[in-house]
Amino acid sequence: MWLSFLRPRDRFSLAELRYLTDQLRKIQIVNEANKDLVIEALRSIAEILTYGDQHDPLFFEFFMEKQVMGEFVRILRVSKTVTVSVQLLQTMSIMIQNLKSEQAIYYLFSNEYVNYLITYTFDFQHEELLSYYISFLRAVSGKLNKHTISLLLKTENDVVVSFPLYVEGIQFAFHEENMIRTAVRALTLNVYHVGDESVNDYVVSPPHTEYFSKLISFFQKQCMDLSAMVLNTLKSPSPDSGGKLFSAVDGIEDTLYYFSDVISAGIPDIGRLITDHILQHLTLPLLLPSLCSEAVNDISVDPVTSLYLLSCILRIVKIKDLANMTAATLFCPVKAFISSSLVKPNSSLAPEGLTYVNGHPDKGVTEEANQQCSSTAAGMSDDGNSHLCSEDTPKSIFNNSHMTFRETLLQYISEGDDVQAQGSLFVLATLLQTKELEESMLDAFGILPQRKQHKKLLLQSLVGEDTGEEQLFSPRNGSMRDGLSSELDWYLRRLEEQFGVCCSLPGAARCPRVHRHQVVDTLVTLLCRENISAETLWDGGWLLRQLLPYSEAEFNRKHLKMLNVSYEKCKNSLTREIKGIWPDLLIRVLLDEWRKCKRVIEAPSPQKEPKSVLLQLDRSSSNDNSVSESSFTAGERMCEVVKVFVLLHQLQIFSLGRSLPEQPPIYPPADRSETSRATRAGLDVSVPKPGTELKLVDAVPCRIAFERGKERDFSFLALSSGESGWIVLADPDNGIVRVTAPLAGCKPRIDEKHPRWLHLRIRPSTLPLLDPTKRGVYEKLKSKGLVDGRWILAFRDDESCHSAYSMVAGEIDLQCSEVERRLRPLFDLERNQLEDQ
């Protein structure tokens, strides 16, 4: 009998559940003496019920019959310790998450116990308790559906009057702890995606709509913080600037993706609320004015951040009204948004002399502008003599009384710095890729691809619309005037009615053909700029490619001439690189960049995300530490030149109506001459590695000390094979190679005071930036400002030194000549054009 009494109970048994329940009922008050017993009982009950849910329904029947949930609530009331509250919330979370039986979930939710726990006044000064409470709320929300959600509501006349889960949850929506914010967002999404109409009405009715305005305010603060980080990075970059920017960008995009998830629930009023709040509290008062203004009292954001945010909002938040109204604002004058109490115009970009009468442009200005569409169209002759962005036009053409945000974006591209140009290109690319945007808005902006124009006009002609047929077969066409005017005007009226933004478009603003010419002109101007990075030029090349083919009136001989001039300059720069420090890697880089550029330009969407414009700020600021004479710097310059050349070359091919080949047209490597020095030396491998035996034909004896006080005798050779070349120091007795270095970039120089000394500059054999896996190492090397190695070789006499110098110079010439020979077909683009014509 005693053995039976001492035998332990089965942990997962009904008897154990009964025993634990009895233990809880005996507890009259929870204190330090019995809290461990209570915690263990609560934890064990959760485990037993989870086990029973999968194996024996009698477990949960007992749980219901004995009203164990009531015991949980009673224990919470009589508890004086936080740890018991934590365990109770954890027990409830485990049960709700793991119970698969619908009956079990219905029972838990059908009583008021869950709502009681939700509304219970916990002491949230304990962070651990708050975390478990939020986890409990999230667990409850995870079980919501159209049947269970009604069990947590209070209604009157079929109208929801109380929803504690939602109300209590959103109180912590803006907690400083990111994990808590994330959990609350998951809770709200679970509520929105249930699809219960009465609940939808509840969450979009006052005062619950304040959640969305607070959400936009929270997002606005994120934007301001990001702007401050961007400005600090530009002014005084630090080692952790990149990490801070990355974290801030992630936070902003997480919020925008949350907006997107909320909208995907399909609650129309929520989409409207988010649209109105974003426009009213962010886009109109901050982002747009910041494009042409500088901050006053730190309440604005910098232009680069504004460009990034505009792109991100359009790319992530898929709301038709938001996309089209944002696009419509770009046609409005800058003064329509700038309040003198908030921001002041930026002298370099803001328009001058724009006058308003009761919020509208001066009539004289409008009447003058109404004549621009026809006069501009007439001015676009076949030779491209347009007054817009022509070579004789001053760069301040957009700084006039008619300047709009659209023109500001174009001005950033044609005149701004690298980051401003890239940010503006992202905005244009995002507009082009935004499916929610009306095609007529793209046409008005000047970025609707011609294939889409023809498609729409063809549809109009097929359904019998005369204007469509006339425009389709008219060489001077360029506008879908009726659709454009009605849709653009409709969104402009909404801006005035809802937000008080008055914008009356002059005649020129209604001429898409003028705008298309402006965009093309701006992009061609960008591609002709020499102070812009290749990365940004590739972005401009992608956008230009999307707009091909053009009509002759938009992409004309002037543009071709500009591109040809820029191409010739770039070709000359590339030719100089053949004589530079890295000719042995030039063809490899060219082949690689050709494939990359082809992939980028022919891609249906940009290969980079808008955040790249911010994340590169830290890297660009650190470039100031690089040594100007370093081979690393020269390698970067060579890669930049190759990238720009490849882009311009491929655009030239596109302009001829030809498709891009997979590989650039270059000659194959030439066979090594039997009379070459490398052949005479017996070099039968691609690289003379240490240990290789060579014939010391033409070798010149020399001495060099790689360590202080330790001079060694070597036989000196300079060898080239194709585009490769090496400086070789071999053992004078047996010709065994001991040391090698790249021939290219060695810059031989005879010492002026010691004519027996030969100075050589020794660069690395490879360029780390070409290997993505070594990008981190490369950045560290650059930041340390490392310089190239230096060799000083001492020869027996002046004649030997001159002989070695001549050997190096001659082999370098052979090496560079081979690179130039292989690239010759690539440089014969003009001859190829004539053949095509």
Curated annotation (Swiss-Prot):
SUPFAM superfamilies for this protein: ARM repeat (SSF48371)
Chain ranges of the FPL domain: 42-192
A Gene Ontology BP annotation from the UniProt entry: anthocyanin-containing compound biosynthetic process
Keyword Acetylation set for record: no
Main location (coarse class): Golgi
Pfam family, one: FPL
UniProt keyword Cell membrane, yes or no: no
Disruption phenotype: Abnormal pale brown color of seed coat (testa) due to low flavonoid accumulation levels.
Compartmental location: Golgi apparatus membrane
Residue span of region Disordered: 366-386
InterPro entries, sorted: ARM-type_fold (IPR016024), CLEC16A/TT9 (IPR039272), CLEC16A/TT9_C (IPR045820), CLEC16A/TT9_N (IPR019155)
The entry's keywords: Golgi apparatus, Membrane
Compositional bias (Polar residues): 368-378
GO cellular component, as recorded: extrinsic component of membrane; Golgi apparatus; Golgi membrane
Membrane topology listed for this record: Peripheral membrane protein
Purpose: Involved in membrane trafficking and vacuole development through membrane fusion at the vacuole. Required for membrane trafficking machinery and accumulation of flavonoids in the seed coat.
Name of the featured protein: Protein TRANSPARENT TESTA 9
Lineage: Eukaryota, Viridiplantae, Streptophyta, Embryophyta, Tracheophyta
Gene name of this polypeptide: TT9
